């Protein structure tokens, strides 16, 4: 189940598993309480593709787009928009790549990217190292050697998150969690496209990544914000 908050005059973007975008206005969807209606009645979804995500924002809003293949780029909301029922190709991906939900960017200059692979490698780098594109594959986010991309259990990019300046990065592995504050994050910080650093052995199988905001006190010391008071995740 996926939902978004929007206004009746705002466009809604639907992204499918093949990286295509489709557009509808929210007022064209049923407003009464019901099970809804099939999107295929309005949009020509490509064969063998399924709708994965919904977006709605102002035209000049920026997003981080990427896939499990380890590539990504920055894109404006207006570049997802299309008037054609067949949609348009936005993200180019290999056959087995999985599309990540695009992440809304608040500060292109200050925000960072946190990338975690399926083998427990973490790389943090400045968001502005990625290009602005209207469509395409993007640039390499994290390096995964070709030999690691083969076999029964190939290494892929598993999590891709926007990491604001004053936030903890919390790595979950089952019942265990590793909290990296802004100071500790430096150990995993590098340049875009590098290999990243392996997490401690207990956290190699990452099951969830959480962004935890800090509240800066008068003495300049950061304090973790109660999750109930935060909308970041």
Protein language model regions, located:
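Short, structured "edge-of-domain" segments at secondary-structure transitions
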Residues: 1-233
């Amino acid at each position: 189940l996926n939902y978004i908050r929007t206004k009746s005059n705002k466009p809604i973007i639907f992204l499918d598993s093949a990286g295509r975008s489709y557009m509808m206005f929210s007022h064209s969807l049923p407003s009464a309480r019901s099970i809804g209606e099939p999107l295929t009645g309005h949009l020509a979804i490509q064969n063998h593709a399924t709708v994965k995500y919904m977006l709605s924002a102002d035209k000049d809003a920026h997003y981080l787009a990427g896939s499990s293949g380890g590539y990504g780029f920055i894109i404006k909301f207006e570049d997802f928009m299309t008037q054609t029922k067949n949609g348009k190709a936005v993200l180019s991906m290999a056959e087995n790549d999985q599309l990540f939900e695009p992440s809304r960017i608040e500060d292109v200059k200050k925000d960072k990217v946190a990338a975690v692979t399926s083998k427990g490698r973490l790389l943090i780098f400045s968001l502005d190292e990625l290009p602005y594109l209207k469509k395409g594959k993007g640039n390499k986010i994290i390096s995964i050697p070709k030999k690691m991309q083969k076999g029964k259990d190939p290494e892929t990019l598993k999590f891709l998150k926007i990491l604001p300046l004053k936030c903890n990065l919390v790595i979950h592995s089952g019942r265990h969690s590793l909290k990296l504050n802004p100071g500790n994050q430096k150990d995993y910080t590098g340049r875009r496209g590098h290999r990243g650093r392996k997490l401690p052995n207990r956290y190699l199988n990452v099951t969830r990544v959480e962004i935890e905001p800090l509240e800066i006190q008068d003495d300049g010391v950061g304090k973790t914000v109660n999750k109930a008071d935060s909308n970041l995740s």
